[in-house]
Regions:
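Phosphate-binding beta-loop-alpha motif at adenosine-nucleotide cofactor sites
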Residues: 151-177
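PAPS-dependent sulfotransferase catalytic domain
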Residues: 1-158
Length: 191
């Protein structure tokens, strides 16, 4: 997707194009806000304001997140004026358990416990008492439902397994979805 929209020829040239897809929330977008980095979730007070600042140039941007589409306290994750839509990649929970156990070097039972934790969140674990990159994930099920049942944004749901087995067709669906959201009438180009 990054190469398709950010290069003239659509050729992916490695990590440079991946840098066009940033993560949100992330510390660099929250630097000018007064929050307590030692308190998990305190950055949520500024999620929408940070997005407004990101969008000041009125250009289309792509972001990735693990965040549930929920309010944290009284704080929305995003707003309609800040987000055109989303693409949610659903992965078979059995594969998520296996992937998590390898990534975090924990056993399958612990990985399943984390996936079912309604209060689950992530942040940069290498930083001590610095929750500036805090993302509220919740459980696998509630995270999925928060995006599936939302009335705020159009969301395109894709199966991770389909991305692997039917890459071209899924990619085409993604491009058509993005073009619709952005009123891009140029259509899908194979070239």
């Amino acid at each position: 997707i990054s190469a398709y929209y950010y290069t003239k020829n659509g050729i992916f040239l490695g990590d440079n194009h991946l840098k066009n897809v940033q993560q949100f929330p992330e510390k660099k977008y929250l630097e000018n806000f007064d929050y307590d980095l030692a308190i998990p979730g305190d950055t949520s007070r500024f999620w929408v304001l940070a997005q407004e600042k990101i969008n000041e140039d009125r250009k289309i941007k792509f972001f990735k997140t693990h965040n549930a589409l929920v309010k944290l306290g009284n704080n929305d994750f995003t707003s309609r004026s800040n987000s055109l839509g989303g693409i949610y990649i659903v992965r078979d929970p059995r594969n998520v358990v296996d992937s998590m156990s390898r990534h975090f070097q924990i056993n399958h039972d612990k990985a399943l416990e984390v996936m079912q934790d309604k209060k689950n969140f992530t942040y940069d674990f290498k930083k001590k008492k610095d929750y500036s990159d805090y993302q509220f994930i919740s459980s696998w099920e509630l995270n999925y439902q928060s995006w599936k049942n939302n009335n705020l944004l159009p969301i395109k749901f894709l199966k991770y397994e389909d991305l692997l087995s039917e890459t071209f067709f899924v990619f085409k669906e993604i491009i058509e979805f993005i073009n619709k959201l952005t009123n891009n009438k140029s259509g899908f180009s194979r070239e």
